[in-house]
Amino acid sequence: DFGNANLVIAVPDDWIDVQTIADLEEVSFDIRSKRNTRLRVATKYPNLTNDFLISKGVTQYKIISSLGATETYPFIGSSEIITDITSTGKTLADNNLRVLKDGFILKSSACMLVSKKSLRNKRKSKMLSFFLKDKKETNLENEN
């Protein structure tokens, strides 16, 4: 098991009343009525974000295109929330953001396919052994 990465919706830690997408929908309407603007969502993945939010009934938002360091957008006032790729959640936490309970847009992981012919090749087999050993050690380090 390696290469796990998820596209998630993250909100500021201090949004204590926002735990789910339904809560986010309420906030989006509040922002629309009180500020006469839409909830700003910073992302590098506008199509996936739009499809997900619309499928969940969230309509009062606008996409802010991110060119990088998306997790900083709420802090600098460029957006209220973000969607971004995360593996461990550490960068989100470091920026006082957290993933909504049902805020997983896309879950992914890497997969390795190896042919029997490749396994019979000593050089390729040795490379595979080194790769798998490295991944095993990395996973053990991440667990500790």
Predicted regions and their residues:
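Domain-level signature for soluble enzymes in the chorismate/prephenate branch of the shikimate pathway
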Residues: 1-144
